[in-house]
Amino acid sequence: MTTPSMQPQWAFMHIAGQDASQYLSPGVVQFAAATDTYFSLGNKFRNPTVAPTHDVTTDRSQRLTLRIVPVDREDSQYTYKTRFQLSVGDNRVLDMASTYFDIRGRLDRGPSFKPYSGTAYNSLAPRAAPNNLMFKTGADSKTMTIAQANIVGSTIDQDGLKINNVALNPNAGEPAVQEGLENWMEELQIGADKKFASRVLKADQPVLPNYGSYAYPTNINGTQTKDGTTVDKVYMCSKGANVQNPDVVLYSEEVNLQAPDTHLLDGPGADNPKDRVAFCAAPNRPNYIGFRDNFIGLMYYNSNGNQGVLAGQASQLNAVVDLQDRNTELSYQFLLDSLYDRSRYFSLWNQAIDSYDPRVRIIENDGVEDDITSFAFDLRGIGDLPYKQVQTHNGNQQSANTTDTCYIGKGNMAAMEINIPANLWLGFLYANVAQYMPDDFKVDPSNIQMPQDKTTYAYMNQRIAPAGLIETYVNVGGRWSVDFMDTVNPFNHHRNEGLKYRSQILGNGRFVDFHIQVPQKFFAIKSLLLLPGSYTYEWSFRKDVNMVLQSSLGNDLRADGARLEIHSVNLYASFFPMAHNTASTLEAMLRNETNDQTFLDYLSSATMMFPIPAGQTQVPVSIPARNWAAFRGWSFTRIKQQETPNIGSPYDPYFKYSGSIPFLDATFYLTHTFQRVSIMFDSSVSWPGNDRLLTPNEFEIKRHIDAEGLCVGQSNMTKDWFLVQMLSNYNIGYQGFYLPENNKDRTYSFVRNFEPLARQVVDDAAAANYRDVPLSKRFNNSGWRSAGPPIFAREGAPYPANWPYPLCGEAAWAAKTQRKFLVDRYMYRIPFSSNFMSMGALTDLGQNLLYANSAHSLEMTFNVDPMQEATFLYILFEVFDCVRIHQPHRGIIEAVYLRSPFSAGNATT
């Protein structure tokens, strides 16, 4: 064995090597073993060289990783293309599975980026409370002032307020708006001779509520006076006949007033501009923005115009053959799910799966636990009525040794009651559910100019959810999803923990200098062993912010000012750390045609989309005659056209959306909208036969009326369809029903995502006195909240509620049961036997034979729930998508793609 002294002294870190017992002298090894219990050496003498320990003469094979700089780059408006020269020397093997693109650039997430809820400025203020301000009012535009004077002094003269005969200095931060009387005792004993001062905004400043108001400092002392303007003193005296001298001085100034993260809920009307002082502010909606899960959309896949290249320089044959109907991104998502627990995040590859809060998608309205009353008390607790202590019970002569004023409260301590649990629950429902309802249900704020483009953040942010639809009393006691929100993308939400994580690892600012590592996902080369030779490797990267970035609200990031710049792309790779003779043996073996490297795309599907116009309920699908040998079945779901970009295009100008992209990242949520599907091979072939509960050639998925009791699991899914899904996912069915093993119950599996729902509603046919009162006429909590959305101020009078009708207790009304289900993150599956010759109708002699050698056409008909927007039927025809990579000689790489029964055409390069 080579001794340590003969080994080269590497100048870089290694992580493996010989154990100490392999190269230390026998005496030292024996001593270490004998004394290990009380003097442990551990790996103190580990040899710092990576395996193998001999027959390696170049440091390139020993390095943990190599950086490869591009030989050419092309930075265009929509793409950034790089070309690398891969040189694999003799007796070395490059591991393409270890490669990744190291990308540096600058990201502007745009003004719509807001990575938090609420406001960062004066968040404790009431929503309609004003700043200290002066404003013009009336026909003659006279000035009115509303202010809180917080600084106490002794005298007021032409120099303003004086404290201990020293006048306040506005340039030194005086009067300080953040200071004042320090405790309630000082407030009780101010004294009639005290004078007060504070700062106030001049009348030509914008009128904004204090909640959310901000002005940046213009002085090291924290003052905010605009440069080039002066601070003027405004004197105030009490409004009385005999009052002559002012007791308040206000220091008026102009500041750079802004509302960085709030907006007004209404605007000034022409009839009474004074009301604008009492306008209510609301926080801007949170909008996390980050790269997509696994950097989906950053690299071009399945795009003819931006096809990648891996070619040997000796032959120039490209090993990358991309198909329009192959879905590399979705395949990678499913592959990861089969390997890892996707609930674990891995920042290196930006792996943080999109999720949603189940409490938002499915509302378990348990009411509120408000058994204990919550009170709010005055800071001093007791009352503040002035009294004096007297000597006896008869007469008012002041007692000796007492002050002339005492403070006595009468009766119980004054208090205000607030139902904190009910307010928290109402706030949760409004912020997490009502804010995300479809735009058709929302209204514009009054007297506010709204943008015309409904895909922008400015429009989405200012739309207001109406009252009555999402309330604490709706479906109380039930577990039910809001019907009109079942078709709203639940992953476009600020409680998407994966997106929030991906946004936060970039930081909390709009402008980001990013440095990311992006893996190769294309199945033909992502695990390839590249043998000695010179190769050209190039790929294109998108710069379209709607494709590369993801936002909580799904707004059009292009229109909202987001920008992406790529400054550099380097390739990092590793050689297998093999001894030369081992590497040469491996190379000789792989050069042999019988040892070609064969890879299978994990999804192995031909993906097809069929448009479903708004309101349509039936979708026909026709597949021309072909040989169906090696066909595995169908997976299908439904996706919105608005959320589906044109992947074949370098830049889709009609894709004005940045939320989750279901057909790329597997955030499916419309799978529950299918009612039935029929499958016909030609006209004479009966498949899947009569071995099920329902009609041959047809799968009934759900029933709205179930007179025969064919539904299952307290939902309206049929037993037949439930059986098909259990069989296709877990091979569970013939042996009874049970939960699948943990290793089969993955993120995108059936049982994990099947959510049956049931509730009761008033049976209007059995209840003669039932009235379906319109939303505007329903009231509950009248007087204690706004008649409109709960974000406005309270109004009205206390009165018995008229909604909802009671469904339990002695006063329960006659009710009927409604059932449904959700099955998000899942594609329905229909399996198909690989032995197509035994798939016909079941008889006493077995199944009828179909002939694989003859071609059959396919007719499918899908019945779906109608939706108010255009969607796609998204089908995966599950086939075998394989590639065979052959490297017969140095610098030559050949690829043969095989796909049956949906051929890839001329897939040989």
Swiss-Prot record:
Origin: domain of life: Viruses
Key words of the record: Capsid protein, Cytoplasmic inwards viral transport, Host nucleus, Host-virus interaction, Late protein, Microtubular inwards viral transport, Phosphoprotein, T=25 icosahedral capsid protein, Virion, Virus entry into host cell
Subcellular location: Virion; Host nucleus
SUPFAM superfamilies, per database record: Group II dsDNA viruses VP
GO MF assignments: structural molecule activity
Main location group: virion
Site (Involved in interaction with pre-protein VI): 733
InterPro entries tied to this protein: Adenovirus_Pll_hexon_C, Adenovirus_Pll_hexon_N, Adenovirus_Pll_hexon_sub2, Adenovirus_Pll_hexon_sub3, ADV_hexon, VP_dsDNA_II
Pfam families: Adeno_hexon, Adeno_hexon_C
Cellular-component GO terms for this entry: host cell; host cell nucleus; T=25 icosahedral viral capsid
UniProt induction comment: Expressed in the late phase of the viral replicative cycle.
GO biological process: microtubule-dependent intracellular transport of viral material towards nucleus; symbiont entry into host cell
Residues modified to Phosphotyrosine: 897
Family matches, as HAMAP family: ADV_CAPSH (MF_04051)
Function: Major capsid protein that self-associates to form 240 hexon trimers, each in the shape of a hexagon, building most of the pseudo T=25 capsid. Assembled into trimeric units with the help of the chaperone shutoff protein. Transported by pre-protein VI to the nucleus where it associates with other structural proteins to form an empty capsid. Might be involved, through its interaction with host dyneins, in the intracellular microtubule-dependent transport of incoming viral capsid to the nucleus.
Record's miscellaneous remark: All late proteins expressed from the major late promoter are produced by alternative splicing and alternative polyadenylation of the same gene giving rise to non-overlapping ORFs. A leader sequence is present in the N-terminus of all these mRNAs and is recognized by the viral shutoff protein to provide expression although conventional translation via ribosome scanning from the cap has been shut off in the host cell.
Family statement drawn from the similarity comment of this UniProt entry: Belongs to the adenoviridae hexon protein family.
Subunit structure: Homotrimer. Interacts with the capsid vertex protein; this interaction binds the peripentonal hexons to the neighboring penton base. Interacts with the hexon-linking protein; this interaction tethers the hexons surrounding the penton to those situated in the central plate of the facet. Interacts with the hexon-interlacing protein; this interaction lashes the hexons together. Interacts with host dyneins DYNC1LI1 and DYNC1I2; this interaction might be involved in intracellular microtubule-dependent transport of incoming viral capsid.
Protein's UniProt name: Hexon protein
